[in-house]
């Protein structure tokens, strides 16, 4: 998979989780990305943001030592940049 394929799959997962309150992050990467995604779309999509944050929180309740700073998530390459995450996820959430 290319970096764009990985990014696209992660955005699709964020979009799906944002619309379904019962989801939980599957791993550390998802939990940290969901947390960031929740923060960057909160003003435009408060309901979806809440779903993402809850999915992240459920994972971190079982794995509290796996929470990373925003800078570390970007450094690891899980997110290219916060503005890019916001723009691309907002587009997916808007057009569904």
Residue map of PLM features:
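Short terminal alpha-helical segments
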Residues: 1-35
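Generic L/I/V-rich hydrophobic alpha-helical segments across diverse proteins
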Residues: 10, 34-38, 49-53, 82
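Intrinsic low-complexity/disordered segments
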Residues: 4, 25, 32, 39-41, ...
């Amino acid at each position: 998979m290319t970096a764009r394929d990985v990014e696209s799959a992660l955005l699709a997962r964020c979009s799906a989780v944002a619309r379904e309150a019962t989801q939980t992050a599957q791993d550390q990467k998802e939990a940290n990305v969901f947390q960031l995604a929740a923060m960057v779309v909160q003003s435009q999509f408060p309901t979806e943001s809440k779903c993402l944050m809850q999915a992240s929180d459920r994972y971190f309740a079982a794995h509290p030592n796996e929470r990373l700073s925003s800078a570390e998530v970007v450094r690891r390459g899980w997110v290219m940049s916060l503005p890019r995450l916001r723009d691309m996820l907002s587009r997916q959430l808007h057009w569904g």
